[in-house]
Amino acid sequence: MHLDHAHTHDGPSAVSADAHRPDGTRRALRIGLGGPVGSGKTATVAALCRALRDAFSLAVVTNDIYTREDAEFLLREAVLPPERITAVETGACPHTAIRDDISANLEAVEDLEDEVGPLDLVLVESGGDNLTATFSKGLVDAQIFVIDVAGGDDIPRKGGPGVTTADLLVVNKTDLAPYVGSDLGRMAADAKAQRAELPVVFQSLRTEPGVAPVADWVRARLAAWAA
């Protein structure tokens, strides 16, 4: 699996904000999850929380335009204690709050570290956006981009910064492929052509192995962060 931190492009995997808090302690690793509306970002966040919460101290920041719907879903599912889940209401296009003006998200992350820290990991979920959505290097250290087979098997071929430069591309809802006519082999080939050595995971949260491959990728990131 590709875990090279020395990328030369200016995409999301370039070096981000200072790795230390003002008091000199090491801050949490921050991983952003972006992708189109309905691709399964929140369900993936929930599954990751369940997979990682026993081994790591983690928290979540969600983004919605005018509501707290994603955060409320995570709270209902009890994936983490309530104080470890917070919501940002962006009031504008989702990419604005994760790339152009990150102040609200950065404050939310820092408040979580102050209030429930020390934390190993903060997951920052973007509101649903298009294929161009990327996170600011000042907000997250790595980005996962989630698409789904119901959006069409041409999505990887269409590219866009989210697809081509995210540190991990997740093709979600693979169990639906036979019902929507999506060719997983074609999607895999197109993703490889767009992303070269950057990793791609095909995922169904309804069938084994579920979120396990993505959770393993996150664990590897955490190990590298702590090294």
UniProtKB/Swiss-Prot annotation:
PANTHER family: UREASE ACCESSORY PROTEIN G. One of its GO terms (molecular function) is nickel cation binding. Keywords: Chaperone, Cytoplasm, GTP-binding, Nickel insertion, Nucleotide-binding. Belongs to the SIMIBI class G3E GTPase family. UreG subfamily. This is Urease accessory protein UreG. NCBIfam families: ureG. It holds the Pfam family cobW. Residues 1-22 are annotated as: Disordered. SUPFAM superfamilies: P-loop containing nucleoside triphosphate hydrolases. InterPro entries: CobW/HypB/UreG_nucleotide-bd, P-loop_NTPase, UreG. Residues 1-10 have a biased composition (Basic and acidic residues). GTP binds at residues 35-42. It is found in: Cytoplasm. GO terms for biological process: urea catabolic process. CDD domains: UreG. Facilitates the functional incorporation of the urease nickel metallocenter. This process requires GTP hydrolysis, probably effectuated by UreG. Homodimer. UreD, UreF and UreG form a complex that acts as a GTP-hydrolysis-dependent molecular chaperone, activating the urease apoprotein by helping to assemble the nickel containing metallocenter of UreC. The UreE protein probably delivers the nickel. GO terms for cellular component: cytoplasm. The gene is ureG.
